[in-house]
Amino acid sequence: MFKITGVVSFIDDDPNAKVKLNSEGRFMEIPLKMAQRFLNNNNDRIKGKKKKIPILFNHFNNLPQLGTVDNLEIIERGVNDNDGLGNKKRKVLQMTATLSNRSFIKALQESSHFYNTTDKHMEYYSPDGFLSGGNSNPSGEMVTGRSAIMKRFPGLSIGHLDNDGYDIEEISLCYAGARPGTILTDASYSDHCGLAEDDTGSNSTAFLKAWAAKPFAMMTSRAGKIAEDINMLGVKNESLVYGLENKEDDVNDKPLPPQQPIDQPIDVEVMKSSLPENNKEDISTTKDTTPNEVEEHNINTIENEISSPFTQKSPDELDTETMSRIQDEVKALAAESASLRDDIKKYIAEALVQKDSGSSSVRRDRSPVDRRDRDRTPPRRERRRRDYDDYDSEDDYEDRRPTKKLFRRSRDEGEFLHSRKNKREHSRNRFDEFEDSRFDEEDRDMYRRRPTPQQSFYEAQSLPRRLLKRQVIQDDFDEEDYYQVRKPAKRQRVIFEDDLDEFYQPPVQQRRLAPRAPVYQEPQYDDYVVVPRQKQQQHVLPAASQRRVVRPQQLRPQFHDQDVEYVTIDPQTGMEVEYEPVAPAPKKRVVKVAQPVQRQVVKQTQPRAPEPVEMEEGEIEEEEEVVEEQLAPVKKMPVPKAVPVKRAEAVDAQPTPPQAAAPTQEYSFKKPTGKTTEAHFDELMDQMF
């Protein structure tokens, strides 16, 4: 995968300029308004409203696209004008794109691999993994994905629509673009796949054919355009392609002799082969020459060159001015050659002195390989053995590292650890000395589980017994110590503090084989708010600081567990019912006659005082539950006084339901001390609320 950056087009300096087209109908520079419209369209493409701008190869629609445009932006860049005006800032439209076509990358890898292995016959190395193989160390020529793509396809070209807006349809990667300054400025290869591992490019042959179909003359004709763009934007030299030649080539430039490092001795034979044949004798012999002899020798050499058949004029035909100029040049060359000869003799003398003195050891120390052998770190085993030497003995070493001694098993313990029992006892004895001193009793309580509001009643059963025995209504109960603080629930039931004792019920005895009794279905409240009773305003809840929230599982935990077998208790005898569950007794009502009931009778009698109603022992007069019988009004008779009717006669005249004749049951507001049932609990709830 390639990440490329390049200039797509220059922006006109005039902000109000219009689109300027050339003779072929192409715009060389775009106005600022058009660039802004290109940016807005590209933002819509990035957001997914439109398709992204594709990247093609040389405007070939029959080949698959190379990638898509990631971003378009307007920046200011320094531009070197080719007309000699110098460097100045200009606005350009810059593109950032991603090339993800595996076929194109594979074709680029194959062509680079063929060029570096077959054509150049040189060693190479690829630090970014663009080419597989090569040298592992940085030796030879460096071949990267950046150099491969910028040496072959450094140009960019816009493919626009022929409409009024000239909207961008695609951007192509090509040999050279037609607009000025449209080249790649940067490229990076980030996929370390290599040539051998890249097997996904099935259309790489099509790209290779497209590259081979281009005539050489067409590619070389674009060389001048690429050179101008490179000089204009100041791109690195690795973008120079197609064998660009130096225009200011000097004919007198000759290759210099190969330079050798100072540390190594100079080979005299190599130096002789690099110098002219006439100067070989001067180096081999130690005879000193005077400047006059050198000047005469150079003059003779130049005369021989002038008299060669390649010259158009003979020495006699040369004028005086030309001869004087040649003599000046010869003198300058003679001075340079004399200084060069002195330097060569100096280097040879130093090399001979170093060879005689035997200073090769110094050069060996300068070698990085020998320095690595001298300062190499000891192996792993040597480092471990060196740690043992720091202590007095091996036992002292083990005492300072008790963790290694715990889990180390010696050969003598093999027979002892053979049986499972001995192995278990041995492992337990190994940690006895650390178990007692690791935690105190108070520290161990910190690691016990704490109940949370999210835990059900089942999970609370697995907690330590001392937490279950803790009373909920104690004054020193710290809620934050055992429960998480949360916001008040939506559904709350208000319970007064003086009624909390009656509301709390002890858990029912559990028996495994007892029949299931009907379970009281309590309304689903999130929690209960316990508030102090106020005499004047009972309907107003106190402040939040005076409230005390009690969870449902604290008040009645037995009714939140639907899988517990309950035992039915007879409330009168207090004995356990073995097999038949006792149904809840019907509610009883006590009827109290406040005034004697008068009825119309045929027989006229004298009125009598009403007989008092005899209350059975244990009955309670409840004024709230008085039943007043609605009877017809009594008609006045000519008899002066009416005859009262007894309660028995009234009952005979209008019988009551059989529930009224059933025996009543005594109710008490005291906290029950014995076993109760769900029916008894319902009765207590009716009395309280």
UniProtKB/Swiss-Prot annotation:
Q: Where is this region: Disordered?
A: 274-322, 354-436, 602-624, 649-689
Name the residue ranges with Acidic residues bias: 613-624
Which key words are in the record? Coiled coil
Coiled coil, from the record: 320-351
Claim: Protein biosynthesis is one of the keywords in the record: no
Q: Where is the composition biased (Basic and acidic residues)?
A: 362-388, 409-418
- Superkingdom assignment: Viruses
Record's function text: May act as an apoptosis inhibitor.
According to UniProt, the name of this protein is: Uncharacterized protein ORF107
Show the taxonomic lineage. Answer: Viruses, Duplodnaviria, Heunggongvirae, Peploviricota, Herviviricetes
